[in-house]
Amino acid sequence: MIINAKGPASFAEKYIVRSIWENKFPPGSILPAERELSELIGVTRTTLREVLQRLARDGWLKIQHGKPTQVNNFWETSGLNILETIADLNPDGFPLLVDQLMAARGNVSNIYFRASIRHNPEKVVEVLAGIHSLENDAEAYATFDYQLHHTLAFASGNPLYVLILNGFKGLYNRVGRYYFSSQEARELTMRFYLKLEKLAQDKNYSDVPALMRTNGIESGKMWQKLRDDLPAEMGHDKS
């Protein structure tokens, strides 16, 4: 098992998670005793204990006082916060994971974009004013696009959408910088921003679904043109 990690805790976490992913510690099984596991991984028991607590919070493990640590079925117990971990565990499946991420974000954003213009059009106009001074580069577009979604999710009146977005953040930032490295993708996105700005200025929330649908189709086609050249290292966590 080859693991790239910056320190003992990171190594231990990646070792255990990869062992779960590769079914060496299958769902429902009991982890080795703390002393045995710390010797196996090569970390102190204190470090291991901290790692186990963190993995339990993320849904990988079940820790109960006085009982051995049990491996969970993470598909049933974890949240969006493990998206980046899954990408790191399965780099070959990264393009498909991104497809699924974009589809999920698109479905959710359809709701809060419309709701934000309906309930708080002034806030939408305010944040979209930033497009007129937006630097024409990948980093600026990726940053602005995430900020736009975050602001509109808040403006929709349902803060749960913000929590969903937070789960996408790390992975989306990686993909966003790659997507917006394309001049054609930036131009497509700017046209969408301008149309959205006009709807917000007119307080026309009724036409938002049609705009989102059209943009989803066009950006989806753009992504398909770009995904085959997706750098392999993008699926790897650097931590």
Swiss-Prot record:
Subcellular location, principal: cytoplasm
Any one GO molecular-function label of the UniProt entry: DNA binding
Domain HTH gntR-type residues, every copy: 6-74
Biological process terms in GO annotation: fatty acid metabolic process; regulation of fatty acid metabolic process
Cellular component annotations (GO), alphabetically ordered: cytoplasm
One Pfam family per UniProt: GntR
Keywords from the UniProt entry: Activator, Cytoplasm, DNA-binding, Fatty acid metabolism, Lipid metabolism, Repressor, Transcription, Transcription regulation
Keyword Ribosomal protein: no
PROSITE patterns: HTH_GNTR (PS50949)
Annotated DNA-binding residue span(s): 34-53
Stored Gene3D superfamilies: GntR ligand-binding domain-like, Winged helix-like DNA-binding domain superfamily/Winged helix DNA-binding domain
Signal peptide: none
InterPro entries referenced in this protein's UniProt entry, alphabetically: FA-response_TF_FadR (IPR014178), FadR_C (IPR028374), TF_FadR/GntR_C (IPR008920), Tscrpt_reg_HTH_GntR (IPR000524), WH-like_DNA-bd_sf (IPR036388), WH_DNA-bd_sf (IPR036390)
Cellular compartment(s): Cytoplasm
Task of the protein: Multifunctional regulator of fatty acid metabolism.
Binding partners and assembly: Homodimer.
Protein name per the record: Fatty acid metabolism regulator protein
Organism from which the protein derives: Shewanella frigidimarina (strain NCIMB 400)
